[in-house]
């Protein structure tokens, strides 16, 4: 399955929540979902009550799009989470939060996860002093994530560093001047602001 390349604001309207796929625009009044909260192509709210399957599917799609993960990748993350100790849904979200592109975004080094993926792919990021250009790389407790020395004069990265205002989660620490951050520990569920009900995702895959 190819990565979605269409208008990302339509995805937010489809899921009925902000997925923060468009960077700064998502934090402004220009966000389309503020103006039109109905799904794209639909004129007026549907009166049909969604089935249990449809509700579970929507929740899975919402999480997948929130993190920009392909279908097969998402299935692998669920399989990984189901084999670990703990509550499967919470472990799934924790695993998604550990993705390098998500951590780069959470640290404020990118305006969106899509931009974070590009920054990682273009070899602007290092982990523990070593270049890592794989967005799906899973960070661990104690890892130091930083913008590479050779990339610090990159125009877009300098703009982001100068405008950084996003609140950094408690499980991360960031030195914005050094363009470096540390994974203090793995996140707890109440520290993950992903707007999904993970139990519905577990139910979807448990059918």
Curated annotation (Swiss-Prot):
Record domain S4 RNA-binding: where: 98-161
Protein species of origin: Symbiobacterium thermophilum (strain DSM 24528 / JCM 14929 / IAM 14863 / T)
GO cellular component: small ribosomal subunit
CDD domains: S4 (cd00165)
PANTHER family: 30S 40S RIBOSOMAL PROTEIN, SMALL RIBOSOMAL SUBUNIT PROTEIN US4M
Name of the featured protein: Small ribosomal subunit protein uS4A
Superkingdom of the source species: Bacteria
InterPro entries assigned: Ribosomal_uS4, Ribosomal_uS4_bac-type, Ribosomal_uS4_CS, Ribosomal_uS4_N, S4_RNA-bd, S4_RNA-bd_sf
Molecular function GO terms recorded: rRNA binding; structural constituent of ribosome
Role description: One of the primary rRNA binding proteins, it binds directly to 16S rRNA where it nucleates assembly of the body of the 30S subunit.
Disulfide bonds: none
Gene that encodes it: rpsD1
Record's subunit section: Part of the 30S ribosomal subunit. Contacts protein S5. The interaction surface between S4 and S5 is involved in control of translational fidelity.
Family classification: Belongs to the universal ribosomal protein uS4 family.
């Amino acid at each position: 399955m190819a990565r979605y390349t269409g208008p990302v604001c339509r995805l937010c309207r489809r899921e009925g929540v902000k997925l923060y796929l468009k960077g700064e625009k998502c934090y402004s009044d220009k966000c389309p979902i503020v103006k039109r909260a109905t799904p794209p192509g639909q004129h007026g709210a549907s009166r049909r009550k969604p089935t249990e399957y449809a509700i579970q599917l929507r929740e899975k799609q919402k999480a997948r799009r929130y993190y920009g993960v392909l279908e097969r990748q998402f299935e692998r993350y669920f399989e990984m989470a189901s084999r670990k100790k703990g509550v499967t849904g919470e472990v799934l979200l924790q695993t998604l939060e550990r993705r390098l592109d998500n951590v780069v975004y959470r640290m404020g080094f990118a305006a969106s996860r899509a931009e974070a993926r590009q920054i990682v792919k273009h070899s602007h990021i290092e982990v523990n002093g070593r270049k890592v250009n794989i967005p799906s790389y899973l960070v661990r407790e104690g890892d130091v994530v930083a913008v590479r020395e050779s990339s610090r004069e990159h125009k877009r990265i300098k703009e982001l560093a100068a405008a950084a205002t996003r609140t950094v989660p408690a499980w991360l620490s960031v030195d914005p001047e050094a363009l470096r951050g540390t994974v203090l520990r793995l996140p707890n569920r109440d520290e993950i602001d992903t707007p999904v009900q993970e139990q519905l995702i577990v139910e979807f895959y448990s059918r």
